[in-house]
């Protein structure tokens, strides 16, 4: 090396070599998803496809059913049972509104006022789930029985006079009327409304309420401007969890209602298990599914909560 030759420049920091993950590691997430995908495929997708094919069959149980892609079954089912569809949506919608009116104050109480009693109240809310749905509904037959304490109180307060005028009860009785069915639906699905509401309310930062108070907002204004808008995810979730199963319920209509209060779920159950008219039952199921999906879509869009669900 000559005296005038510059020394070699020091080597700079070498960039770390990114190793490509092995094929086995890249497939791990997909293997974890596989059980859930298989479950949905076997117990949701395949039965749905089977029922869809059943709805376009013609024939009878004696002669056998054959897929003929005959959609007249849908038209006949909708024409014959449209009162049951209207009744189902009316009862489910009324029960959902009642669940919201009853559940929101209770969820608010649990989230902000219950204090050390919060866990106990939550246990009481979910306690009905430890009892059979059927037994809980049967209990309402005793509660609403003719001559019972509840009916006597309602008669004394002349509440039944108003509900009879509205067509929700008969003269002096509640059982086997629309009011009995709605009461059963409201009671059975009320926890599905309370729990999502409580979850949303419990996540609200208490400092927002303090800030509203510092700005001289009244409690009513704070609720209208702060609490209720921030609890909309719970309102939407609770509404969906209540309305969707209530619209297809048949237990309450069968046990607490009469032939005049029959819902479409009762018709589907009867067509499947008694009449054995499988195409009509399947068609009714898909019509109900389409109506509920349409109602839910309109509700979500009108409430402006597309990003919350």
List the model feature ranges, each with a label.
Residues 35-38, 43-44, 127, 187, ...:
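Transmembrane alpha-helices
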Residues 79-112:
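Transmembrane alpha-helix signature in integral membrane proteins
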Residues 33, 106-143, 209-210, 223-224, ...:
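Cytoplasmic-entry segments and transmembrane alpha-helices of multi-pass inner-membrane transporters
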Residues 2-6, 10-13, 198-209, 213, ...:
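C-terminal transmembrane helix and the adjacent membrane-cytosol boundary/short C-terminal tail
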Residues 66, 137-185, 220, 256-260:
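Membrane-interfacial helix termini and adjacent extracytoplasmic/periplasmic loops
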Residues 44-81, 89, 147-148, 153, ...:
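Short membrane-interfacial helix/loop motifs at transmembrane-helix boundaries
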Residues 23-28, 55, 60, 73-80, ...:
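Interhelical loop and adjacent transmembrane-helix boundary motif
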């Amino acid at each position: 090396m000559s005296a005038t030759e510059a020394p070699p420049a020091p080597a700079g920091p070498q960039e770390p070599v990114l190793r490509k993950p092995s094929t086995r590691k890249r497939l791990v997430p997909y293997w974890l998803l596989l059980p859930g995908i298989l479950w949905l495929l076997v117990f949701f997708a395949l039965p749905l496809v089977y029922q869809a094919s059943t709805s376009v069959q013609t024939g009878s149980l004696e002669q056998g059913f054959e897929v003929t892609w005959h959609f007249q079954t849908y038209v006949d089912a909708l024409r014959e049972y449209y009162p049951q569809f209207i009744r189902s949506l009316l009862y489910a919608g009324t029960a959902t509104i009642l669940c919201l009116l009853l559940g929101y104050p209770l969820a608010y109480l649990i989230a902000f006022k219950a204090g050390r009693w919060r866990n106990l109240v939550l246990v009481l809310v979910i306690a009905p789930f430890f009892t059979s749905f059927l037994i809980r509904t049967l209990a309402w037959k005793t509660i609403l029985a003719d001559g019972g304490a509840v009916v006597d109180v309602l008669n004394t307060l002349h509440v039944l006079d108003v509900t009879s005028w509205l067509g929700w009860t008969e003269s002096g009785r509640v059982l086997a009327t629309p009011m009995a069915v709605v009461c059963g639906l409201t009671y059975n699905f009320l926890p599905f409304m309370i729990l999502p509401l409580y979850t949303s309310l419990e996540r609200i930062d208490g400092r927002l309420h303090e800030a509203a108070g510092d700005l001289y907002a009244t409690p009513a204004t704070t609720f209208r401007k702060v609490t209720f808008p921030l609890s909309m995810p719970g309102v939407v979730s609770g509404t969906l969890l209540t309305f969707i199963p209530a619209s297809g319920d048949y237990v309450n209509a069968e046990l607490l209602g009469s032939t005049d209060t029959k819902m479409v779920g009762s018709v589907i159950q009867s067509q499947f298990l008694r009449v054995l008219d499988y195409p009509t039952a399947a068609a009714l199921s898909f019509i109900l599914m389409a109506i509920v999906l349409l109602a839910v879509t309109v509700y979500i869009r009108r409430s402006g909560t597309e990003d919350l669900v």
